[in-house]
Curated annotation (Swiss-Prot):
Taxonomy of the source species: Archaea, Methanobacteriati, Methanobacteriota, Stenosarchaea group, Halobacteria
Function: DNA-dependent RNA polymerase (RNAP) catalyzes the transcription of DNA into RNA using the four ribonucleoside triphosphates as substrates.
EC top class named in words: transferase
Annotated protein name in UniProt: DNA-directed RNA polymerase subunit Rpo3
InterPro entries with a match to the protein in the record: DNA-dir_RNA_pol_30-40kDasu_CS, DNA-dir_RNA_pol_insert, DNA-dir_RNA_pol_RpoA/D/Rpb3, RBP11-like, RNAP_Rpo3/Rpb3/RPAC1, RNApol_insert_sf, Rpo3/RPB3_RNA_Pol_subunit
Natural source organism: Halobacterium salinarum (strain ATCC 700922 / JCM 11081 / NRC-1)
GO (cellular component) term, any one: DNA-directed RNA polymerase complex
Amino acid sequence: MSSQDFDVEFVDRDDREARFVVRNITPAFANGIRRAILVDVPTLSIDTVRFVENSSVMFDEQLGLRLGLVPLTTPEDYAAGEAVTLALDVEGPGTAYSGDLVSNDPEVEAADENIPIIELKDDQRLELEADAVMGHGRDHAKHQGGVAVGYRHLQRVHVVGDSPEYADDDPQMLRGVIEEDDELVPTDDFDNDLTTRYPGKEVEIEDVDGAFVFHVESDGSMPVEELVLRAVDTLVDRADELEQAVQL
């Protein structure tokens, strides 16, 4: 399947979250996109920590685990296996935050600056040096750039007539995105209630063949659009490798 075989249309997006519709794909390919976003796009994550001083109440190993789960911005030109060094030096009283991490690459920093690492009391200090390496989510969850990835069929709504005169006016809830007159409408625009969108009408709902609505959230290691594009690239690379292997 080439990129010309399917069509992508964004419903809404920002740096961290996006909803988009992909058409002309199979359920298997949709699931392949979901899995690729979760496990095939490499990201930077702290892997090794060297403690210079730790007089806090928390053991080195526990702090190392916390640091490993801090999302780091991942430049596009970093390849799997590459590393970057970060340092942290904080004295109490106060709290050491993810934003206190200083990288030797200005393009690499904590994706969120306000993640608490440890609270330090008077005369307590945390000084360390850490190596962050590129890795895949299939090897460790800390490398999953997609923190929430899901998809569902795009649904089309048809008005089939008027509601009976004395019909119960119960809410008819539907969540996601619907297709209406060839336009995409998020259901939260009408509080997810079809009776609000189509008052006094009877409607029928059907799945649109080969069309899926994706909802993707990034941990901040990269913009969500870049995360999706990198995931699709990994699928293309796998397909090319398989084609070459079959030809052999």
